[in-house]
């Protein structure tokens, strides 16, 4: 049973990692650009703790959706900088 679980889990990991531009309909996107954008989505979903749904939404519309830009902003700590209170000038 453990071997079967391991094989299924391994296939799942390989299928997630083996995604390419054509799989998302990004036929005009070079592989290097796709890999960079896909890595951003993976970081956003996994490192920020939002999970696979976040990764999927980030990839929507071949990374052209506003959700992708929000994910990049989150990784670049844009929101945290905006939320820091600025002391009043004297």
Swiss-Prot record:
Tissue localization of expression: Expressed by the venom gland.
Tell me the first and last residues of the signal peptide.
1-18
Signal in keyword set: yes
- Matches recorded under InterPro entries: Crust_neurohorm_sf (IPR035957)
Q: Does the keyword Transport apply?
A: no
The main location is secreted
Name a GO CC annotation attached to this entry.
extracellular region
Compartment(s) of residence: Secreted
Give the record's keywords alphabetically.
Secreted, Signal
Family in the record: Belongs to the arthropod CHH/MIH/GIH/VIH hormone family.
Q: What else is known?
A: Co-purifies with alpha-latrotoxin.
Q: Provide the function of this protein.
A: May increase the toxicity of alpha-latrotoxin and/or other venom components. Is non-toxic to mice and to the cockroach Periplaneta americana.
| Protein name stated in the entry | Alpha-latrotoxin associated low molecular weight protein
Could you tell me which species this protein originates from? Latrodectus geometricus (Brown widow spider)
Q: In the record, what lineage is assigned to the organism producing the protein?
A: Eukaryota, Metazoa, Ecdysozoa, Arthropoda, Chelicerata
